[in-house]
Amino acid sequence: MGYLTSSFVLFFLLCVTYTYAATIEVRNNCPYTVWAASTPIGGGRRLNRGQTWVINAPRGTKMARIWGRTGCNFNAAGRGTCQTGDCGGVLQCTGWGKPPNTLAEYALDQFSNLDFWDISLVDGFNIPMTFAPTKPSGGKCHAIHCTANINGECPRALKVPGGCNNPCTTFGGQQYCCTQGPCGPTELSKFFKKRCPDAYSYPQDDPTSTFTCPGGSTNYRVVFCPNGVADPNFPLEMPASTDEVAK
C-alpha cells in the first residue's frame, strides 16, 4: 500500500509540473517599492528594491499581463489605492490596472506551439521595463526593452502624476482607440514608438511589437527599472506613498 501511495503522489506531482508552460520571474530593480500585479494568474505582490516574485503560468494561458503599481497604500486587509496601475483598490488584482501602466503581455503555447509576448504602451507608461526569455533562441525570441525617460519627456496633454497616459484614455475616439476597424499611428503614438521601438505604441502596432519563443520550453523574466539607480534616463524621485503593509 505504501508503494502505491508513493507512486500516486509521484504521478500527481509530475502532472502538476507538466501543466506549467513557463516560469516568469518578476524583479524590482527600482530605487523604490513597486507593487507588482499579474492577471489572470498571480494577483499581486509588494516588491521592495531587489526583491523577486516567481509566477508559474499554466499551458494555454492567454490575455495575460504583468505591470507595476506605484505610490500604493494598502491596509492589513489588502485594500487601498495606488497612484498608477491601481486595480480596483486591492492588492491582489483580478482585473486590469488603471492607466497609465507599462505592460508585459503574454500568451503561452498558442498557434504553432509558440509563446507570444510583448511590452505594451497602449495603456501608457509608468515604469521602465525589460521583458526577456531566460534563454534566448534567436529570431524573435530575444530580450525587449522600454527604458526611455518617457515620464520626463511626456507631452503635456498626456502627463499625469506618476506617469504618461495614453491618447485613447485621454482623448477617446477611433483615431486613438482603434475600436471600429483599422487604424494607423498618430503623432502621439509616434512619441512612444520613437523612445521604445520594441513596444506597442497603439492597438494595431503588431508587426514590430509581437515576439515569439518556443512554447513549453521557455521561461521569462520581467524587470522593473532594469538599469536600477544607475539609469541616466529615468528620474530617481520616490513616487508618493504612505505606510504600506507587506503581503
UniProtKB/Swiss-Prot annotation:
A GO term for molecular function: beta-glucanase activity
One Gene Ontology cellular component annotation held by this UniProt entry: cytoplasm
Tissue: Highest levels of both isoforms found in the outer pericarp, with smaller amounts in the inner pericarp.
Annotated disulfide bonds: C30-C225, C72-C82, C87-C93, C141-C213, C146-C196, C154-C164, C168-C177, C178-C183
Signal peptide: 1-21
Subcellular location: Cytoplasm; Vacuole
Keywords of the record: Allergen, Antimicrobial, Cytoplasm, Disulfide bond, Fungicide, Glycosidase, Hydrolase, Pathogenesis-related protein, Plant defense, Signal, Stress response, Vacuole
Origin: domain of life: Eukaryota
Gene3D superfamilies listed in its UniProt record: Thaumatin (2.60.110.10)
Enzyme Commission number, as recorded: 3.2.1.6
InterPro entries reported in the protein's UniProt record: Osmotin/thaumatin-like_sf (IPR037176), Thaumatin (IPR001938), Thaumatin_CS (IPR017949)
Gene Ontology BP terms: antifungal innate immune response; defense response; killing of cells of another organism; response to salt stress; response to virus
Mutagenesis / variant outcome for changing I24F: In strain: cv. Rutgers and NP24 II
Record function comment: Has antifungal activity against P.betae and F.dahliae. May be involved in disease resistance in tomatoes and/or have a possible role in fruit development and ripening. Binds to beta-glucans and exhibits beta-1,3-D-glucanase activity.
Membership in a protein family: Belongs to the thaumatin family.
PANTHER family reported for this sequence: OS03G0233200 PROTEIN
Name of the protein this chain belongs to: Osmotin-like protein NP24-I
Organism from which the protein derives: Solanum lycopersicum (Tomato)
Lineage, uppermost ranks: Eukaryota, Viridiplantae, Streptophyta, Embryophyta, Tracheophyta
